[in-house]
Swiss-Prot record:
This is Insulin-like growth factor 2. Residues 87-92 are annotated as: D. It comes from Neovison vison. It comes from the Eukaryota. It is found in: Secreted.
Amino acid sequence: MGVPMGKSLLAPLTFLALASCCFAAYRPSETLCGGELVDTLQFVCGDRGFYFSRPASRVSRRSSRGIVEECCFRSCDLALLETYCATPAKSERDVSTPPTVLPDNFPRYPVGKFFQYDTWKQSAQRLRR
């Protein structure tokens, strides 16, 4: 009435196989070098392009290493890779954002010499009354 040897190993082996798949899927980061690093950056950044060193506005105070130092010699993740993506330049033909339109109830105040003329005109009308 014992359990056959094959069936007794089935449950632990199944668990081991599932556990190894899950751990591989949740691996937080990996090292990328050479062509693999460039291919990954092209995939992540797409049409925006990328920099090998971060733009000055994105460099943290604690480090100013380039992507090779960060991803090839150490491990890097998707968030770090995205910091090296270039921001797209807005072209004249870009119509993704509509032009700013003032609402109808926006107060319009006269400026310049016309303002002085309107002030003089209002004063003259008051004097006539």
